[in-house]
């Protein structure tokens, strides 16, 4: 890889770090290509990406980004999981690491806050942004639905009383 390609890669990674809200740093030593592809597939499904990068290039790309504090983690065979969703890369990495001991989570960051391995595991237990939005909308619409039901109930009860009275009159 020549100097121009390296500069281009640093620029690409820097913009990727600038747009992301979460990053997880992992060691992948001993994993097969098939296992890495399976992990990448899981990341794509969650809206994240998993990349193996050169440590020096990644450290350079971290400059002037919210993830600058992660530079010390880049030693040995490292890979990054990155996403705009703050929970997605952590969830996929933790889930995959439970099944495959070769994937070691070193740490990560979320919106500028550096997290250790335990922090990433705690982050993985949180619901995703879409799940939280769904819950919030459910909480907002539930009272309106109940109010509509309560306001319609007296009219329905009154209609049933009139109907019962009418059928009683017809029967008599």
Swiss-Prot record:
For the keyword Transmembrane helix, the answer is: no
Q: Per the UniProt record, which residue ranges are transmembrane?
A: none
GO biological process annotation, one example: translation
Annotated GO molecular function terms are: large ribosomal subunit rRNA binding; structural constituent of ribosome
> What Gene3D superfamilies does this protein's entry cite?
3.30.70.1730, 6.10.250.290
Cite the entry's keywords alphabetically: Ribonucleoprotein, Ribosomal protein, RNA-binding, rRNA-binding
User: What cellular component GO annotations does this protein have?
Assistant: large ribosomal subunit
Query: What is the similarity comment for this entry?
Result: Belongs to the universal ribosomal protein uL10 family.
Under HAMAP family, the record lists: Ribosomal_uL10
The protein's role, per its UniProt record: Forms part of the ribosomal stalk, playing a central role in the interaction of the ribosome with GTP-bound translation factors.
Q: How does it assemble?
A: Part of the ribosomal stalk of the 50S ribosomal subunit. The N-terminus interacts with L11 and the large rRNA to form the base of the stalk. The C-terminus forms an elongated spine to which L12 dimers bind in a sequential fashion forming a multimeric L10(L12)X complex.
Can you name this protein? Large ribosomal subunit protein uL10
Q: Which species?
A: Rhodospirillum rubrum (strain ATCC 11170 / ATH 1.1.1 / DSM 467 / LMG 4362 / NCIMB 8255 / S1)
